[in-house]
A protein has these predicted regions:
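Active-site beta-strand-loop-beta-strand hairpin of nuclease catalytic cores
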Residues: 83-93, 118
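Active-site-adjacent loop/helix micro-motif of nuclease/hydrolase catalytic cores
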Residues: 96-110
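Conserved beta-strand signature within the Rossmann-like core of class I S-adenosyl-L-methionine
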Residues: 120-131
Length: 185
């Protein structure tokens, strides 16, 4: 087993899946799309300490610093349920799905509700998750347990089954990682 000390770097990359033409919608807001991808690919100060809560906190700081509204309510009426998206800017809603895989339905419904009826807050949702490979590397190389978290592969597999319930375009972004070995001295 490799350790973080034996690596020169862990390189982040993104896998993407466009549901209901989400990428085309985001391309009409190209600066916003590029900003999201830049935030997700920005180097992590210490990837060895990148637990789920630490990664959530890092993304919170990065998005808020770029003007994204944090934890906007899905419903406007205070008497309505307290559902919240993670981030909102320029009619793009972001949900970070680093939690348990069982939250997929709740997360997707937030996008649907925020896009329809009187709410009409978003044109597209961006669902940020990690890949199965990311979770495997984090556990085997860095001893960070991401087991049980939702994966990009699962969202990509499940989302088409929700086609009658989820009408809003959703851009699924899977954060992946590659090991970059050190060169012998």
């Amino acid at each position: 087993m490799q350790t973080a000390a034996k690596l020169s770097a862990l390189s982040l990359s993104l896998q993407k899946f466009s549901y209901r033409f989400a990428e085309q919608v985001l391309n009409s807001k190209l600066a916003t799309k590029e900003e999201i991808e830049q935030v997700l690919l920005e180097p992590v100060p210490d990837i060895a300490k990148l637990s789920r809560p630490a990664f959530n906190e890092l993304l919170l700081q990065r998005f808020v610093n770029r003007g994204w509204k944090s934890q906007p309510a899905v419903f406007d009426d205070p008497a309505d349920p307290g559902a919240r998206m993670d981030f909102l800017k320029e009619r793009v809603g972001i949900e970070v799905g680093f939690g348990h895989a069982s939250f997929i339905g709740i997360d997707l419904l937030k996008f649907q509700v925020a896009s329809y009826s009187a709410l009409d807050k978003i044109d597209v949702g961006v669902y940020v998750v990690t890949t199965g490979n990311f979770q495997k590397v984090m556990k085997s190389v860095l001893s960070q347990n991401w087991e049980g978290s939702l994966t990009f592969e699962k969202v990509k597999r499940y989302l088409p089954h929700f086609k009658s319930a989820i009408q809003v375009p959703i851009y699924v972004v899977g954060i992946d990682v590659q090991l970059v070995p050190t060169r012998p001295a």
